[in-house]
Amino acid sequence: MTSVIFMGTPQFSAPILSSLIDNGYDVLAVVTQPDRRVGRKHVLTASPVKQVAVAHDIEVLQPEKISGSSEMARAIELAPDLIVTAAFGQFLPTKLLKAAKVAAVNVHASLLPKYRGGAPVHYAIMNGDSETGVSIMFMEKKMDAGAVLAQRAIPITDQDDVGTMFAKLSDLGRDLLLETLPKLLAGELTPVPQDESQVSFSPTIKPEEERVDINLSARMIDCKVRALRPFPTAHIYLNGVRTKLWHVTVLDQKTDLQPGAVVSRDKHHLAIATGEQGVLSLDELQPAGKPKLSITDYLNGTTDALTVGEQVAE
């Protein structure tokens, strides 16, 4: 039986761990981030990966930082055949990677060398890409730079957001890993080095990047809204109030009004001008301090005039 140490944290990683367990791999231990307080009530919550491990009585290691930790020493002591990572969220020291007797491999949610880094799904949607995918690659000290063992692509639809794509890519990564590991163990794969001239990066989204530039085209604003939904969520300032954008629609029309101006409005509809003469319907909003609101509920509750031509969004 092939022994594995699995390293991962979010929901993306949990089905991948479950599949290894269900398919006869001997998971010696799971390394995941420490429990975090979540939600308005700040409830201390185990990561999805830890929850799977606990359910199967697998040893759980939770270092705040893996490098130099006692948890790293324990992982090295276990001497697994494979180290498998999926969205673990930390750099792994070379000493740890070399503890794997066969290989240390990573399930990365992009078509490498495109979108190395921590937010590949967000960037694929935000940039309006028509497809993304999963890469299974050797791990090395440099971030997401190892030779690729397998790749598979899937389309990004106009309805997809980061939530739906994470779910699709998790399933894809699970299936591709299960196909790849037996071939790796049998020595049947030829690793393909990444083309360094094609490398791009997807660093973690910063809070200031969550604000929508109303001068972008309507399509690119829609892409940004979907790329940041359900987390961390895009926002604009609507009549001076920070307002999250949950759902918008690109309208098939043009306007000469300045970006941020009201193009049309009735009891159930509000559309604003964007860059490149675009028009964007605001369908579901969340003003600061309030719950999500349909545009109908928002318009019923606002005292703002929101008249056609009025500059309201920035």
From Swiss-Prot:
EC primary class: transferase
Catalyzed reactions: L-methionyl-tRNA(fMet) + (6R)-10-formyltetrahydrofolate = N-formyl-L-methionyl-tRNA(fMet) + (6S)-5,6,7,8-tetrahydrofolate + H(+)
Pfam families per UniProt: Formyl_trans_C (PF02911), Formyl_trans_N (PF00551)
Keyword field: Protein biosynthesis, Transferase
Keyword Transferase recorded: yes
A GO molecular function held by the record: methionyl-tRNA formyltransferase activity
Keyword Nucleotide-binding belongs to the record: no
Record-linked InterPro entries: Fmt, Formyl_trans_C, Formyl_trans_C_sf, Formyl_transf_N, Formyl_transf_N_sf, Formyl_transferase-like_C_sf, GART_AS, Met-tRNA-FMT_C
EC id: 2.1.2.9
UniProt similarity note: Belongs to the Fmt family.
Function according to Swiss-Prot or TrEMBL: Attaches a formyl group to the free amino group of methionyl-tRNA(fMet). The formyl group appears to play a dual role in the initiator identity of N-formylmethionyl-tRNA by promoting its recognition by IF2 and preventing the misappropriation of this tRNA by the elongation apparatus.
Listed name of the protein: Methionyl-tRNA formyltransferase
Native organism: Levilactobacillus brevis (strain ATCC 367 / BCRC 12310 / CIP 105137 / JCM 1170 / LMG 11437 / NCIMB 947 / NCTC 947)
